[in-house]
Amino acid sequence: MVKYTKSENLLSIVKKIILKRDKFLNLANKIPTPFYVYDKEGMDESIESFVASFQRHIPNFQSYYAVKLNHHPLIVSRAVEKGMGLDVASIRELNIALKAGAEKIVYYSPAKSGNDLKYVLKHADKVRIHIDSFNELHLLGKLTSKLKIKIEVGIRIHTPAHGLWTKYGIPLQSLRKFWEEASKYPFLKLNGIHFHQSRNKTVSFYVNTIRDLANYLKENFTSDQLKSVALVDFGGGFEHCESEGVIVRKGLHWPKYKISKNITIEEYARAIGNSIKKCFDPIINATYLSEPGRYICNNAMHIVLSVADIKDKENCILNGGVNMVGWQRFEKEYFPLVNITHPSKKERQCRMWGN
């Protein structure tokens, strides 16, 4: 069940923006609004808190930034500089990752073509592929044998509890069969298992999937197969952002804002770490990988807008709008606008219409 908190609890976020007020205003004096601001400090804080929490509870842990969330060169390069690997979902994203100097790359998408796989194999020294299906396994296996190129791979799995997310990967019950099929291809080194679901407001997805996967491995894998499991990727989907929520509209009345009350990244890490110790440690010796996206880049970018016109005390026109984000996120979710020329710690009602 989703929990909500009061909008007053956004004050900590507002205070952080106000502390950076002079930097924003200096930029606005030099560059016409609207524009985007890359916040290196904000990104560093997110990376450091994420990595510290998970390494505290999972010593053999690696983090990979999900490039699809924001592929701006400054974001991607900084993730690499801070020691993260990169998770890519297309050849375009792979090229961005290579240009950023990434040495650790995971390539996963459910619709890889033969040409995609050939291109990835050229960079097999830096990239591991997470396979989505038996058909893809056979396609990649034949390509590696033909080209005589070795590459490390994993397979994405799902359980019935994953709902619509069962469109990705293979059923958990097919995992041993997949492992046996992969052994037919000498240039494929299958050593990883991958699962993911977005927007997990609680830890139950991770805890339950780890439990189910561990039980399956114990009951179905041979001792040699268990020894070959060197990596488990539990994806991302951490619902952490303190400013997110929903807009509740009732007729012509002012909308109500319900701010999501989410658990902390430390709580995610602790629960996942405890599940790994309980379920995986007795049967496999693996490295654990996660692919955070929004957690890393959410506070790394801001949009600076100006008021173009004031219609009345309740309505004004801005010189930019939701098109600057790329989708209608602000129509369904709540994010605070902070007045940096006349800052206040009190929230006020005003309709801010986009250009």
Where are these regions (language model features)?
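A charged N-terminal "starter" segment
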Residues: 1-151, 184-185, 189, 222-225
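Short, solvent-exposed amphipathic alpha-helical segments in soluble enzyme
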Residues: 80-81, 144-147, 170, 304-306, ...
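Short helix/loop capping segments that flank catalytic or ligand/cofactor-binding pockets
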Residues: 97, 139, 242, 298, ...
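Active-site beta-loop-alpha junctions enriched in small/polar residues
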Residues: 41-42, 66-72, 91-92, 110-112, ...
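Active-site loop/helix belt of alpha/beta enzymes
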Residues: 2, 159-306
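A generic local secondary-structure boundary/capping motif
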Residues: 141-145, 167, 340-341
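Charged (often Lys/Glu-rich) extended helix/loop segments that serve as interaction or gating elements
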Residues: 48, 271-277, 281-355
